Amino acid sequence: MLSTVKNLFGEFMNAMIKKLLQGQAVEWRALGEVAKKISSGGTPKTGIPEYYNNGEIPWLRTQEVNFNDIYDTGVKIIEPGVKNSSARWIPANCVIIAMYGATVGRVGINKIPMTTNQACANIEVNEEIAEYRYVYYCLANQYEYIKSLGTGSQTNINAQIVKKLKIPIPPLSIQSQIVAILDTFDTLTQSISEGLPKEIKLRQKQYEYYREQLLNFKATI
């Protein structure tokens, strides 16, 4: 059932954009035009264990980027590790795309300021153009496409590929409505994924209810 719900995610998003716009044209823009800044990070020298011992600075790796809100990291580093590497602080609410290996194409949102390694593309969204959660959902919807762009033995992508990715940019009011609906849908999906077996039937009924609400959503534009 969970796979069915996830497969419907992209269909819902595309259908909602069309329904909410009611036939209006929508511009597709590259992430490089939607972002204030797109950056990557770095890795402090692993040969200097002091950089990693008793650290307090969150340092994100791509295995922690998995279509999620990120409130903490498994590894912490110290300030000299930041200063002596390409690791850089990013503000909260960047949209992060994993660029390397098995995790390529996965996206997440950092909910606290943190640093990242070089395999993360960190998108600081210009919120005069787009809501960061809207950008997140657009990129999550393009996961298979982004993954297909990978090259080399590890199927990596790079910052230039990320900057050229295009997403539809409807008015901010429409973006807000889409985010509100997809946040509810995402919460439901997570509940199904994490629920005990005896709860699955109840969750399925809830899913069917929200599906009906989504398909009958009436927008005020």
Write out the residue ranges for each language-model feature.
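Non-catalytic DNA-recognition/assembly elements of restriction-modification systems
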Residues: 19-42, 199
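Amphipathic alpha-helical segments
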Residues: 1-6, 10, 25-26, 166-204, ...
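Specificity-determining recognition surfaces
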Residues: 50, 138-167
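Sequence-specific dsDNA recognition surfaces
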Residues: 34-48, 63-92
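Short, structured motif recognition centered on aromatic/hydrophobic residues
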Residues: 26-31, 35, 57, 90-91, ...
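A short glycine-rich beta-alpha junction/loop motif
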Residues: 100, 114-121, 153-171
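Short, recurring structural edge motifs at helix starts
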Residues: 2, 15-21, 46-49, 153-154, ...
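A short beta-sheet element
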Residues: 61-62, 76-140
